Structures are given as C-alpha cells and as structure tokens.
A protein has these predicted regions:
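Active-site neighborhoods and metal-handling regions in enzymes and metal-associated proteins
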Residues: 1-258
C-alpha cells in the first residue's frame, strides 16, 4: 500500500482549509437550537465556507446533494440535510464539514446537543469524544496503525458501547479520500502498516449505544443503526510532523467538545 506523505512546508493550504472547517464548526454552537432545520444548517455552512474562501468537498461528490453531512440521533454518518426535519429538544446531531482550499482538504465533525439531552445520550457523546482524543495519543512514526482501533475498542467496550465497522477514517490531502484506511476497530492485518512522518489522515470513530450493525437508507447515503439506537461521532484531521501530531482541525476557540 502506497501512503502519500507531505512536507510541512507544502501543506499550508491544508492547514487553512482545516482552520476554516474548525471555525465554522465553532460557529454552529450559536446556530444549532430547537426549531432549526438541517437544511438551514447546510446553507449556513455553505455560505460561510464560500465567504472564507473555500469550497465544500461533499457537494456533488459521487452524487451527494448537499455541502455538509448532518447525522441525527440514530444516523451514523452521511445524513443528508433536509427542509423537513426541525431539530427537537433532546436530539443529538453530528455535523461533518470538509473545506477545500487550493485542492487541499480539511475534514472534521462534531456532536451538537439540542437542549437537554438524556443521560445515555450525554454519556455516548462523552465516550465517543474520549475515543477520538485518546486514540490520537497512540500516533507516532513507526507505530502500527492498528493501535488506533485497539484504543477505540478498549474505551467503547469498557463503557458497553459498540464500534461501527462499516465506515472508517482515511488519508486526506489533495484528495478527499486517500490511503490508508484508518480502522476504528482492531484488525491484525493492519499491525504491519505503520505511521510515517508526513501523513495526513482523519480519525473519526462512530460509536453506537447498541449493536455495531448499520444499514443504508433508500437515499443511498444515510447510514443508520440497525437496532435504532443512538450513534455519535467526532472527527479530526491530523498531520504527523516529525515526532509530533498536529491536529489541523483543532477548535480555534477551544470548543471542540462541550
């Protein structure tokens, strides 16, 4: 498997795309509330991406009809924004934004809580965030990529949650999706694939309150939990810069998780 690597001096546009993505996700904290539709969130993000000098990677990507993904409650990922669904008290919503600047991609997603949510929903969000942050700590040149999935499973299973297996993180940079796949569960076949200096990739664990099984709805995109339980996801784009890990999509205002 060929893994694309980049010099730090050549990824400034990737840094800028990632910063725009993170800035917009920060701004959504003041927008998302009871009564707003996911289509309105999509329009807000599209407008902000354009005003900040970027373009939305998901729009028309393999036929996807919107600029962002909005995944609500039992939706695992790739939810399509809709005019028909207003957010309600107790909802949990993942918003996934990818900005492109000069061909470089910055990809991130976060969970948003609508009003007062259930204890179980809050715990799911807490643990999913922990899965992401703790898994970033295992990344270093020469270590096995499989360590990410091992760490995520360890945290999720300890809290009686499951890890989605049908979707994964991925290399990113001048393409939306590059090698390697970043699995969020342990697979021994990935023990011999190592992190290398200069890699850019996403880590984006999807954690379910029930079983890990998923299915795709008739729109061909929306992935939901088969058992209709809640799902949550957090995502960062990261860059291995020498011996350090640079979180490209870190919140400018320190509000990635709230």
């Amino acid at each position: 498997m060929k893994i694309k690597t980049y010099k730090s001096s050549e990824i400034n546009s990737c840094r800028e795309a990632s910063k725009i993505t993170a800035t917009i996700l920060d701004e959504l904290n003041n927008l998302i509330s009871v009564g707003i539709t996911t289509d309105e969130i999509d329009k807000f993000c599209l407008d902000r991406i354009k005003k900040l000098g970027g373009s939305p990677a998901p729009l028309f990507y393999r036929g996807f009809p919107k600029s962002i993904c909005t995944s609500l409650n039992r939706v695992i990922c790739h939810g399509i924004p809709s005019k028909d669904r207003k957010l309600e008290e107790g909802d949990i919503l993942n918003v996934d934004v990818t900005t492109v600047i000069d061909g470089w991609h910055g990809d991130s997603s976060r969970m948003y809580k609508v009003g007062n949510i259930s204890v179980k929903a809050q715990n799911l969000c807490n643990i999913t965030h922990a899965c992401l942050i703790e898994s970033l700590n295992v990344i270093k040149p020469g270590s096995s990529i499989s360590l990410i999935g091992k760490k995520i499973e360890e945290i999720a299973y300890l809290n009686n949650f499951s890890v989605v297996k049908d979707f994964c993180g991925h290399g990113v940079g001048l393409k939306f999706h590059e090698n390697p796949s970043i699995l969020h569960y342990y697979d021994k076949d990935y023990d011999n694939i190592k992190f290398v200096d200069g890699m850019i990739f996403t880590v984006e664990p999807m954690i379910n309150a029930g079983k890990y099984h998923s299915k795709i709805l008739n729109d061909g995109w929306t992935a939901v939990t088969k058992d209709k339980t809640l799902s949550a996801q957090y995502e960062h784009t990261v860059y291995i810069n020498g011996d350090s890990v640079e979180i490209l999509t870190e919140s400018p205002n320190g509000v990635f998780y709230s």
